[in-house]
Amino acid sequence: MLFHVKMTVKLPVDMDPQQAERLKAEEKEMAQRLQREGSWRHLWRIAGHYANYSLFDLPSVEALHDTLTRLPLFPYMDIEIDGLCRHPSSIHADDR
């Protein structure tokens, strides 16, 4: 299943800077691993915001939930999710 996910990060203004940097490094490592594994298919930064649009390819809503809740920055995110399905006019073979 494909999911379009908008993640907006809202770190507390009083968070220890070292903790924030550690969380960001852990998040980057996990995001890159999930991309290499193929479950996090695309990742785009939203210009001017501490936010991203992502495309996840996972077997179920539960798998998406499990993946998102394991992200180190999850406690500091506002997340919006849209499930996607193949459009009948699409010419791309890798749509699912």
UniProtKB/Swiss-Prot annotation:
Q: Which reaction does it catalyse?
A: (S)-muconolactone = (4,5-dihydro-5-oxofuran-2-yl)-acetate
InterPro entries in the record: Dimeric_a/b-barrel (IPR011008), MLI_dom (IPR026029), Muconolactone_d_Isoase (IPR003464)
What GO molecular function annotation could you give as one example from this UniProt entry?
Answer: muconolactone delta-isomerase activity
Identify one Pfam family in the record.
Answer: MIase
Q: Could you list this entry's UniProt keywords, alphabetically sorted.
A: Aromatic hydrocarbons catabolism, Isomerase
**Pathway entry:** Aromatic compound metabolism; beta-ketoadipate pathway; 5-oxo-4,5-dihydro-2-furylacetate from catechol: step 3/3
The record's listing under SUPFAM superfamilies reads:
Dimeric alpha+beta barrel (SSF54909)
**Domain of life here?**
Bacteria
A GO biological-process term: beta-ketoadipate pathway
State the EC number(s): 5.3.3.4
Oligomeric form and interacting partners: Homodecamer.
What protein family is recorded?
Belongs to the muconolactone Delta-isomerase family.
Record's protein name: Muconolactone Delta-isomerase
